[in-house]
């Protein structure tokens, strides 16, 4: 299963990074250059019919390979911000998605909107890294964490002033997210175990999500009418990556969905 492969490779990488830069040294680097995260809840909470999009900076994926050959992460991010993205998602996983923490740091330096560190996070060190490199919120995938692990990581993120987007794909994942106290719940139409898509997932899961939660729809989103349909179901914002990455002008494609 691809999720297991990514998880194992991420564990290997993390072990190496911890040896190069131990936790206390990573924390000291933050103390010498403090960063104050932005208000992610305010940025993503829908106001009336406003369309809010988390636009993604993504070079590749395990299911599609390289998506964007002419990949300039900063140029893409600036184009997103110019065209009114609510936030930017930055892939930092290097092997399967060709991402980098350096992309996150670079984009933070030149943009003002909230940034999501999108990676396979299972350790507090990765959350501290996210803060050091300039993220305002992190992705936590319910499928790859136990209830207790998810709760612990979510609480640690908040302790640092970060928010978390807790990604779910089924009722079991949703139970974990609610138990952990997630405020932002992402419904991923794509099953990460086999990459199959279920575009009716929001219809199935949203009725079980408390009204106080911010709901994000993820994957397979490229049609304004479908976005409006999901808004009517209660979706606050949309995470869109591959669709924009395949377009010649990602900013123009973003603007067309707003």
Swiss-Prot record:
GO terms for biological process: L-tryptophan biosynthetic process. The keyword rRNA processing does not apply. GO terms for molecular function: indole-3-glycerol-phosphate synthase activity; phosphoribosylanthranilate isomerase activity. CDD domains: IGPS. Pathway: Amino-acid biosynthesis; L-tryptophan biosynthesis; L-tryptophan from chorismate: step 4/5. InterPro entries: Aldolase_TIM (IPR013785), Indole-3-glycerol_P_synth (IPR045186), Indole-3-glycerol_P_synth_dom (IPR013798), Indole-3-GlycerolPSynthase_CS (IPR001468), RibuloseP-bd_barrel (IPR011060). The keyword Iron does not apply. It is an enzyme of class 4 (lyase). Pfam families: IGPS. It comes from the Bacteria. It catalyses: 1-(2-carboxyphenylamino)-1-deoxy-D-ribulose 5-phosphate + H(+) = (1S,2R)-1-C-(indol-3-yl)glycerol 3-phosphate + CO2 + H2O. Keywords: Amino-acid biosynthesis, Aromatic amino acid biosynthesis, Decarboxylase, Lyase, Tryptophan biosynthesis. Its EC number is 4.1.1.48. Belongs to the TrpC family. HAMAP family: IGPS_A (MF_00134_A), IGPS_B (MF_00134_B). This is Indole-3-glycerol phosphate synthase. The gene is trpC.
